[in-house]
């Protein structure tokens, strides 16, 4: 038996399809690059990386963190994934560019061809109907359907365009997160919204035997798994080779992010019923199409001797001129590009997702090439970030902790002056039951771990709209050209933390 949640990592807005014996899932990656990650599975429970659809999106100044600009909380949102007549299709909007992107490929691992669809389709979902007509369903509060032209570049002239359902004036959250599927002659639209009297993510489904007819239905799941009042919702359904059906949704889980949840679906009179007696089961059984298959981990340690592993993503577009990976030495080096006021504007910050319910990371930093005022180290990346690192001040090396508060105030705790320019840093995070706390440590010459600063409170906020991540960073506060060298990154999950 398998236990929910499945990945225990921040993979929000999941969309899952099956092609023969393989399941594929796409998820929102926002401002992290490369972007639009695709995972694969043979049992819907265990997942591994397949590919990223793009290295960078449009390479705008904001996507590159230039001139104080950024795309936090924007970037690529809520992609849908389809397989139609031998081709894969992925479509999403980017909230910073206000464009709708469509990528296509004959193979799941690419190469992917990029094009635009005229218009902006929030949380869109594509339908290839059996008569050869193409549609996109989308919207917030009001859910619309628009017929697209044959080459999927724009709405079809005089094509179908109509309102399907509405949750207008819902004070919490109206319908969005559209997933449209045609199953046994019926059209199904799966949506997320909130209860009107309080914040509670809820899954809804409407169906019709015609795109021009009335869509009927309602809520199909309102359950928080007994977890902090955080509802499970948003996603579609997928069938197995033996004819069973499952839904892949997600649950807000505090600062660690939004985590996928898997639950069974059964059919009665052409309508889907989610879970077991209306609730998400703690345990779920799914038969693997490839029993015994060994999956590559989605997060983990790295000695940097094998290139940049796919578990790493950059915060915004990387600038290859200012980072260097030395596989022979096992090092990742960041050189500062411009003076920054704080960590979130640092270029080439390398990140990995944190994991529920707790995790820790360690890294060794060589600060010998820092310039005056430079800061380098290990962070818990979000808008209210925590970081432990080393700085060069009046020609001497000092340990420090950075503590960004919810009110925007940045506190700095300075440790002792150290003689060594090489140090180890450790960051521990506890997300259990939304405790959402981080602690920072350092050590010199492989001695004892020494705490620095106070316990830091982590938050999931809409300004970044992503789960907290470990990050390796280096930025300049006075002059550019300094650098920091990282090696021996170690990742510990809940069972390995000592």
Model regions: which residues?
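Carbohydrate-active catalytic/glycan-binding domains of CAZyme proteins
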Residues: 1-498
């Amino acid at each position: 038996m398998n236990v929910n949640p499945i990945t225990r990592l921040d993979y929000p807005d999941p969309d899952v399809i099956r092609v023969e014996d393989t399941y594929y899932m796409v998820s929102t990656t926002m401002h992290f690059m490369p972007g639009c990650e695709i995972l694969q599975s043979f049992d819907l429970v265990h997942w591994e990386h397949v590919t990223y659809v793009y290295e960078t999106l449009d390479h705008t100044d904001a996507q590159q963190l230039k001139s104080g600009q950024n795309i936090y909380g924007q970037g690529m949102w809520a992609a849908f994934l389809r397989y139609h007549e031998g081709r894969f299709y992925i479509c999403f909007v980017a909230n910073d560019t206000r464009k709708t992107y469509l990528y296509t490929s004959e193979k799941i691992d690419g190469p992917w061809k990029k094009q635009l669809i005229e218009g902006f389709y929030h949380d869109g979902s594509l339908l290839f109907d059996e008569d050869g007509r193409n549609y996109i369903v989308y919207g917030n509060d009001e859910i619309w359907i628009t017929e697209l032209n044959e080459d999927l570049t724009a709405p079809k002239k005089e094509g179908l365009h109509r309102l399907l359902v509405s949750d207008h004036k819902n004070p919490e959250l109206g319908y969005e997160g559209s997933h449209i599927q045609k199953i046994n002659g019926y059209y199904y639209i799966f949506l997320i919204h909130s209860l009107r009297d309080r914040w509670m993510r809820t899954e809804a489904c409407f169906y019709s035997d015609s795109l021009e007819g009335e869509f009927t239905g309602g809520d199909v799941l309102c359950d928080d798994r007994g977890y902090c009042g955080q509802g499970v919702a948003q996603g579609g359904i997928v069938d197995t080779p033996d004819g069973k059906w499952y839904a892949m949704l997600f649950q807000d889980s505090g600062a660690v992010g939004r985590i996928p949840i898997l639950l069974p679906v059964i059919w009665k009179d052409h309508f889907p019923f989610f879970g077991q007696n209306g609730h998400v089961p703690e345990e779920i059984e799914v038969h693997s199409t490839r029993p015994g298959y060994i999956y590559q981990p989605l997060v983990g340690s790295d000695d940097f001797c094998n290139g940049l592993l796919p578990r790493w993503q950059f915060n915004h577009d990387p600038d290859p001129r200012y980072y260097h990976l030395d596989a022979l030495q096992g090092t990742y080096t960041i050189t500062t590009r411009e003076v920054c006021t704080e960590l979130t504007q640092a270029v080439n910050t390398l990140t990995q997702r944190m994991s529920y319910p707790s995790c820790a990371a360690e890294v060794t930093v060589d600060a010998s090439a820092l310039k005056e005022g430079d800061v380098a180290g290990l962070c818990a990346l979000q808008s209210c970030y925590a970081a432990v690192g080393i700085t060069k001040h009046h020609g001497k090396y000092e340990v420090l902790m950075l503590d960004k508060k919810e009110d925007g105030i940045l506190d700095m705790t300075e440790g002792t002056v150290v003689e060594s320019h090489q140090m180890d840093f450790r960051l521990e995070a506890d997300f259990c039951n939304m405790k959402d706390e981080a602690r920072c440590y350092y050590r010199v010459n492989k001695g004892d771990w020494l705490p620095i600063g106070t316990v830091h409170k982590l938050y999931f906020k809409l300004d970044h709209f992503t789960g907290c991540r470990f990050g390796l960073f280096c930025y300049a506060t006075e002059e550019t050209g300094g650098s920091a060298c990282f090696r021996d990154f170690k990742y510990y999950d809940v069972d390995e933390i000592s």
